[in-house]
Regions:
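Core dinuclear metal-dependent hydrolase active-site scaffold
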Residues: 1-42, 49-118, 126-133, 176-199
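Proline-aspartate-enriched helix->loop->beta-strand connector
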Residues: 40, 118, 134-151
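Short secondary-structure boundary segments
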Residues: 47, 123, 149-151
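Charged helix-capping and loop-helix junction motifs
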Residues: 82-83, 130-139, 160-164
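Accessory terminal helices/loops
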Residues: 144-145, 149-199
Length: 199
């Protein structure tokens, strides 16, 4: 399985099972990122904000996948500030992939997320959980591969978001890749930081 990062919270996973796109962003919704034009068999959007719901930017050839959805909140106030958020758990090539979307709360029960192969988790704060909260989730979920998302870089992102620097400093076994990560059953436990988005 290959995991391509298109910036912000948008990932494309591809393999023999097909292609799934998570949280594509609308044109001009994320400063510094160009509009998307992708192809997939399934598009999964965690919520309906423009930086996560650009289904119109993905040409879809439908195919069935095993997907589990967990409803959570986009804030610490049971959704009263920013609404609901959906966590997607995908069974892809016998790997358990979890995309946390724009989660902004701490869940009491993470049993369905535990021991996943890949965890994509926001770290930028303000709109979502921050680095401190993300690290608490990671400790509880115990994923094999952690991919931080929804943060600010020098080239793109919202000014109110934190960068990934604090997260990197507090993470172990950090690996840097360009814009694509190959994952299989033998991939070692690590935190993966993409050097740049494919955009």
């Amino acid at each position: 399985m290959n995991i391509i990062w298109h910036g912000h919270s948008c990932f494309e996973i591809t393999g023999k099972d097909g292609t799934i796109v998570f949280d594509p962003y609308q044109a001009n919704s994320v400063p510094g990122l160009n509009s998307l034009k992708l192809k997939a068999n399934l598009v999964l959007c965690s919520h309906e904000h423009d930086d996560h719901n650009a289904r119109n930017c993905v040409e879809v050839a439908p195919k069935d996948f095993k997907v589990t959805c967990i409803e959570t909140y986009h804030d610490h106030h049971q959704g009263s500030h920013r609404g609901k958020n959906t966590i997607h758990i995908v069974d892809f090539e016998d790997l358990k992939v979890v995309h946390m979307g724009d989660i902004g709360c701490m869940m009491d029960d993470v049993s369905k997320l535990k021991n996943c192969d890949v965890l994509m988790i926001p770290i930028g704060g303000y709109y979502t959980i921050d680095t401190k909260e993300a690290l608490k989730y990671i400790e509880r979920i115990k994923p094999r591969i952690v991919i931080p998302m929804h943060y600010r870089s020098h080239e793109f992102g919202y000014d109110v978001l934190s960068t990934n620097e604090e997260f990197i400093q507090q993470s172990s076994s950090v690996t840097y890749v360009d814009d694509c990560l190959e994952v299989n059953k033998d991939t070692k436990k690590q935190t993966v930081v993409y050097k740049k988005p494919r955009n």
